[in-house]
């Protein structure tokens, strides 16, 4: 069923973009929708494949082995830092630290910025969690902040490329031409 839907872009197109719940202040929702613009999630084949090819080097086996080694090292160091402790706040000290590190490694986010990424992430998903006191407006604002950060990081990678996803976006091309600012921005969303 999933394969059939993914191949039937006439009836199940991604081109309509996102239907963002705009409870509360519609201004924030409108800003988020403008920031999302056209991005890899809103393209159908064959355009979707063109964007996917830009990002694929980050997901090749050799690159993923490097990422895996870095994450294993991080987890080993993290567990060593907890050794001998009688109590651990598992969610904040382990369960959230590991995926944020993996995401930041993949994207190329400097380690010193990981706390910001975690805070934005918690605010973005917190509106859906009854245990967190985040409203939809705060979640939308967090999205705009992380989007601005992503645009900043891509711009930085244009002059300081590294072996990361944001550098692939910064230097990506379509049909032999550099990505437009709007396209790069959409890929940050």
Segments predicted by a language model, with ranges:
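Central I-helix of cytochrome P450 enzymes
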Residues: 96, 100-105, 146, 173-189
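Active-site substrate-recognition loop segments, prototypically the cytochrome P450 B′-helix/B-C loop
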Residues: 1-91, 100-118, 122-132, 136-141, ...
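Cytochrome P450 catalytic core segment centered on helix I
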Residues: 119-181
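Short, well-structured alpha-helical segments
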Residues: 72-75, 118, 166-167, 181-188
